[in-house]
């Protein structure tokens, strides 16, 4: 069922969810999980614009009430750098087709294996060709967690928030603005993990690695500052950098050093901002 109006939506949820103004209280989790959350998820995807917006808001608030909440993995990653844990991996799954059902399956597996560190991500390009905007994507992840009783932090990630190289050549500020606009849309939706992909701006023509990586690290630092300025209070969004464009030459340790040294220098010049918690390299 897809709700036809926000009134119908509210009435149908009454046995499980109490809505008073902007306050949402879950009064019967079992009834919510027994079909109502499925209808809410479908309405958040296929309803009219008012119904979609209201359904997504309700899913967010229900998730907040039950503990199925978007979170940043920043502290977990920096903990690894400090030697606080080892011998684990963090799968990052690009869920795009039938997102609600696929995330449900992943969370059932996570519960069976007692796995807590897993990421659901979607790239900028995937958002476009799947017609799956940030608010809808996060709603599907949260709704899936509610359905499966997975009341734990949810790591939702913007994968490859990539600067388009072709546009950057003719309109560099416009190309950066496109990524910033996407970030501005994604952060309020719970995308508190973002991979900044400016690796498309690397040019191999200059003689030094610093010059080759210049646009990559300087624009990455610029976008880092922007994210720190728009992230919610109390949240340090986990940020990733990229030094090798997918499908191009493999990365080298020297390129990594050049990128990180330049990035840290450029970020320090902009102020006192938390930097990257991970970096991706091209390995074939």
Across the structure, where does each feature detected by a protein language model lie?
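Alpha/beta enzyme core
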Residues: 100, 104-117, 135-136, 143, ...
